[in-house]
Amino acid sequence: MAETIVMIHGMWGGSWYWGNYKKFFEGKGYRCIIPTLRFHDMDPKAVPNPALGATSLLDYAGDLEEEIRRLDSQAIIMGHSMGGLLAQILGSRGLAKALVLLTPASPGGINALKPSVIKSFASVLSGYGFWKKPNRQTFNEAVYSMLRLLPLEEQREIYDRFVYESGRAASELGFWFLDAKGASKVDEKKVSCPVLVIAGSKDNITPASVVRKVADKYGAVSTYKEFPNHAHWVIGEPDWQEIADYVSVWLNQALTGSGH
């Protein structure tokens, strides 16, 4: 039976942005399942559901857990950006055969508020009550934080597909130290499967220095790989295939038990 990969998108995104990876990994014989997070299946130009603003990371994780538990076998869970944090939460619930974290957001306990990260969220953070409202980056922020290595035309195309994100989820991520519920916390002792953590040296929103700490958190089960010519949009930047190839080789080794 083919191995299953569940691919979890990040902030402002949707299942659409996994197109390259879906085609690549289906070509390797994997079955790919690409959920869309709650309230993200919307017209980018439409007014977002007001309930989005108060949606927690744990709401997203709960929805994903339900979907994953319906599968007939344990899946590989792959997440990009905020999806990488959701993958870690799901991994700590014993739901993953392996975790692949692509430029992941960091769990509570790791300080991610570097100057470039704050700049990435400047317009969001400047609005009063941002922690309970739907939010969206400006085009310039999206380019600076995520899309800077793409051609202008592609930057526009991707930005125009971005939807609103939950202010609560963003706050649980960035300001975990103010969150009494600890929504972004992950108990690393409960993650026993192999973990691959990918960083881009040019990433502004999940800087490599922070992503390395994510890998360190999982100790012996984790593998850290940093790509010097990549930033945040590793699923679609020029030469994205080199990262997908690396992931594919690592998965082969991790799943056959020949080391990771």
Segments from the language model and where they lie:
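Active-site glycine-rich loops that stabilize anionic/oxyanionic intermediates
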Residues: 10-13, 201
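Conserved alpha/beta-hydrolase
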Residues: 26-48
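Conserved acidic catalytic loop of the alpha/beta-hydrolase fold
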Residues: 59-75
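Gly/Ala-rich beta-loop-alpha elbow adjacent to hydrolase catalytic centers
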Residues: 79-83, 87
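Flexible "cap/lid" loop of the alpha/beta hydrolase fold
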Residues: 95-132, 169-177
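Short beta-strand/loop motif that positions the catalytic acidic residue
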Residues: 191, 197-199, 203
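Conserved alpha/beta-hydrolase "acid-adjacent" motif
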Residues: 204-210
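Catalytic active-site module of serine/aspartate enzymes centered on a nucleophile-bearing elbow/loop
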Residues: 221-260
